């Protein structure tokens, strides 16, 4: 049986793990990193690059380098949070035909799942290189507070990348699996505080030994899918823009190249200030005016950073209160606080979380790797490699339908253990009504319009009758991935309509199929480019070796032989500048043949 991989598809960084001899192992990428930047770059020669190579060229190619795409996945263009992001990123965010938030790169319109699929493809290839076998199945993590649309969009991304997503698992739950599996302790309740690059989650989880099984039961979850390290970076960037404008009278916010440099510098400074009290941000030639080039040189202290972001950390504590209330437990019942996500390395985050829970936070798991490790454990459970583990997760938000008067009527309450199925009987609002519209909603507001619309469908051919007489049975079936199937049935006639809820936007099957084909085509382009680079490098190495031999004073060689070799070198140097692989290989072989004579005569 082929391996099932565990992937943490993060806003800022992604990570991949697999069970090896029953133990989770984080897999290093081709650059030697244990995490991969969630960055996708589109180059001038129409190549797609992912991870560190994409991040490295972001400064010189800001409009075609995409990052923090996870913040757009499953969202509408008109959402306030998307509109806020438009002002902060150098790339172009647009509205698709159905109103979803997409991006435009080099005159091509791309859906967030399509871009996320490029990151997943890199993860897939990394795993295949490590395992030396084809990988087709994965467990992918999402923020616990992701709604149905965002979960479905993540599954779509996996499909485009050529992966069968066997399970979507909540990030804090995955971290709990990573933390609690090997710890042979008494039953305990933990709080997983997960502050990542773009999202925040808090989950209250009970770990118990039940009849020889380690049971992980999520008691409650809450969060904010638009709060994370990217927001901390933005605060630093805005402060740098403000300071520079005061000193130089120039506003850098309209300069995409300068903004990309500021972003990189802000992220670097933020990381440094977790271990030092002060750092310098030094960006020469950040811009220019009529008097010449301008340089940015600003000192930033840890206390200054803390004053800039303290309210963001406070914002994360409100969901913690709600999660405790929903779980019906007090702070003193929490045995351990687990920190997950790179932003939790910040000392002020650790202090404020510790103060809130009135307990010292745990720092004995790697916050960047725990989620991927947990995903690999869940993959092991699904494949039967890991036994005696039971995971009971919950739905983060209430699911219901719109009923008469524009009210949201819940069917599945938030924090209900999944998978689950709930059925409720409704009726018609008018006499002789022959059809009803089932409008599915997700959220906590009483007014239907104030909740997230997941989609609508009609149940037709209802037997005419006075209002209130027909019995329409509505069933909500929520699977282990947190994805919803809705069925409506006229109990008298047996007429039934059933759909898997996809948001009123989302990707159609045809769009997904086209994106899969596009991804496969790009994979061939990437392979060809990789072969070209390898071929060029081999030729370059041959040229270097032969040139070195020609300079050897002790070399005995005829003038015409030297001329032939030098001509071959010139030809090969010219061919290396092109992209004809066969010609490069042929000339390289010719040069090697000619140089063999040198070796024999030496």
From Swiss-Prot:
Its taxonomic path starts at: Bacteria, Pseudomonadati, Pseudomonadota, Gammaproteobacteria, Oceanospirillales
What switches on its expression?
A: By stress conditions e.g. heat shock.
An MF annotation (GO) of this entry: ATP-dependent protein folding chaperone
Q: What is the role of the protein in this entry?
A: Acts as a chaperone.
In-chain residues carrying the UniProt-annotated modification Phosphothreonine? 199
Name by which UniProt lists this protein: Chaperone protein DnaK
* S-S bridge residues: none
Q: Which UniProt keywords apply?
A: ATP-binding, Chaperone, Nucleotide-binding, Phosphoprotein, Stress response
Query: Domain of life, per the record?
Result: Bacteria
Q: What HAMAP family does this protein's entry cite? A: DnaK
Please name the InterPro entries in this protein's record. ATPase_NBD (IPR043129), Chaperone_DnaK (IPR012725), Heat_shock_70_CS (IPR018181), HSP70_C_sf (IPR029048), HSP70_peptide-bd_sf (IPR029047), Hsp_70_fam (IPR013126)
């Amino acid at each position: 049986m082929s391996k099932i991989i565990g992937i943490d598809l993060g806003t800022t960084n992604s990570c991949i793990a697999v069970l090896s001899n029953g133990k989770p192992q984080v897999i290093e990428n081709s650059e030697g990193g244990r995490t991969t930047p969630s960055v996708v770059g589109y180059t001038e020669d129409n190549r797609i690059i992912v991870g560190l190579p994409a991040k490295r060229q972001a400064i010189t190619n800001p409009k075609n380098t995409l990052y923090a795409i996870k913040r757009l996945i499953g969202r509408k263009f008109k959402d306030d949070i998307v509109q806020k992001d438009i002002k902060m990123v150098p790339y172009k965010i647009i509205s698709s035909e159905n109103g979803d938030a997409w991006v435009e790169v080099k005159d091509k319109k791309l859906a967030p799942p399509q871009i996320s699929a490029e990151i997943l493809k890199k993860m897939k290839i990394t795993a295949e290189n490590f395992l030396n076998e084809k990988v087709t199945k994965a467990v992918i993590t999402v923020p616990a507070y992701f709604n149905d649309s965002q979960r479905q969009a993540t599954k779509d991304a996996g499909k485009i990348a050529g992966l069968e997503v066997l399970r979507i698992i909540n990030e804090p739950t995955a971290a709990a699996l990573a933390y609690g599996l090997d710890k042979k302790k008494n039953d305990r309740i933990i709080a997983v505080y997960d502050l990542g690059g773009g999202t925040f989650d808090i989950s209250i989880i009970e770990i118990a030994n039940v009849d020889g099984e380690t049971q992980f039961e999520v008691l409650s979850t809450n969060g904010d899918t638009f709060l994370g390290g990217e927001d901390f970076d933005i605060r630093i960037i805005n402060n740098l823009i403000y300071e520079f404008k005061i000193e130089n009278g120039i506003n850098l916010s309209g300069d995409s190249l300068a903004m990309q440099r500021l972003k990189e510098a802000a992220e670097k400074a933020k990381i440094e200030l977790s271990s030092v009290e002060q750092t310098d941000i030094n960006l020469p030639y950040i811009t220019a005016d009529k008097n010449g080039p301008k340089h940015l040189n600003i000192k930033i202290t840890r206390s200054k950073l803390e004053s800039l972001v303290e309210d963001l950390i406070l914002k994360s504590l409100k969901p913690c209160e709600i999660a405790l209330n929903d779980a019906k437990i007090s702070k003193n019942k929490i045995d351990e606080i687990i920190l997950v996500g790179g932003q939790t390395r910040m000392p002020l985050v650790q202090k404020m979380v510790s103060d809130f829970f009135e307990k010292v936070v745990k720092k004995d798991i790697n916050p960047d790797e725990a989620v991927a490790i947990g995903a690999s454990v869940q993959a092991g459970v699904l494949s039967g490699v890991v036994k005696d583990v039971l995971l009971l997760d919950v739905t983060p938000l209430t699911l219901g339908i719109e009923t008469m008067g524009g009210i949201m009527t819940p069917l599945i309450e938030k924090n209900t253990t999944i998978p689950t199925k709930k059925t409720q009987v409704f009726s018609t609002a008018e006499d002789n009504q022959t059809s009803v519209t089932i409008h599915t909603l997700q959220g906590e507001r009483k007014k239907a319009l104030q909740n997230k619309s997941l989609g609508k469908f009609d149940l037709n051919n209802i037997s005419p009758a006075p209002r209130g007489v027909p019995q329409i049975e509505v069933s909500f079936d929520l699977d282990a991935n947190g994805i919803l199937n809705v069925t409506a049935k006229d109990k008298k006639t047996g007429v039934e309509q059933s759909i898997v809820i996809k948001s009123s936007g989302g990707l159609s099957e045809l769009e997904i199929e086209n994106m899969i084909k596009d991804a496969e085509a790009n994979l061939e382009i990437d392979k060809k480019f990789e072969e070209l680079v390898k071929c060029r490098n081999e030729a370059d190495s041959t040229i270097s070796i032969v040139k070195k031999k020609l300079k050897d004073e002790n070399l005995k060689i005829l003038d015409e032989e030297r001329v032939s070799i030098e001509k071959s070198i010139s030809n090969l140097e010219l061919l290396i500048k092109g992209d004809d692989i066969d010609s490069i290989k042929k000339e390289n072989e010719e040069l090697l043949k000619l140089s063999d004579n040198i070796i024999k005569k030496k």
